[in-house]
Amino acid sequence: MAKWQRSFFQPVLPLGEDGRRVTGSKEHIALSRMAAGEGMVLLKNEKNTLPIRKGTKVALFGKGTVDYVKGGGGSGDVTVEYIRNLYEGMKIKEDEGKVEVFDKLAKYYEKDIQKQYADGAVPGMTVEPELPDEILNEAREYTDTAIITICRFSGEGWDRKCEAAQDGYVLDGEEKRNSELSAKIFENGDFCLTNAENIMVEKVKKAFTHVIVVMNVGGIVDTKWFRDCDEIQSVLMAWQGGRSEEHTS
């Protein structure tokens, strides 16, 4: 069993001739961040809504604002020292003078998601909270630019509804748990928006002049809801870019 020792003790012992931990070195963090940015795909950008102009005020909508998914489940998961979500990344950009963020809305999502985590939820497997009209109206008074983030968590055997079990494939403990949880959270399947996400998106579309969507997903998802929608000007397929994706310029 000695050969498996590194799998059970994270982070592993320092590597490299100078004793640095190569896997978590500053050089690799910078490379990972660059790769995350280069891997993103701008699916839609009407009226040159992106890039956001310097000094723009923004309101961040959707649980994905703080419920960031860095990668896949099972063998697609990795151990990292920290994870930076969209809100945290945007606050860094605010400190740099590039944007201004409506904090009250982001804090609302942060409080809700932290409670769901405390109750046993994992990133990407959380319920979209109801968007209070009071906060929506305050956000609309603050800015005319909204950023909606949709997130999904993917893993073997449970991130899509299928008939695999009929072919003799048996889900293990974690797969079975996640499959059951996914069916409960994503009543339309995680390929589509949930009912709560649809309601949130419709509210934002009606309230804001400029609407940007960020897709923090690891697999194929439905695009009909934004493809031919004039109220949504820009869509960024951000995928799942590791621990610092949301700090990508």
Predicted regions and their residues:
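C-terminal non-catalytic regions of proteins with extracellular/luminal or membrane-system context
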Residues: 1-249
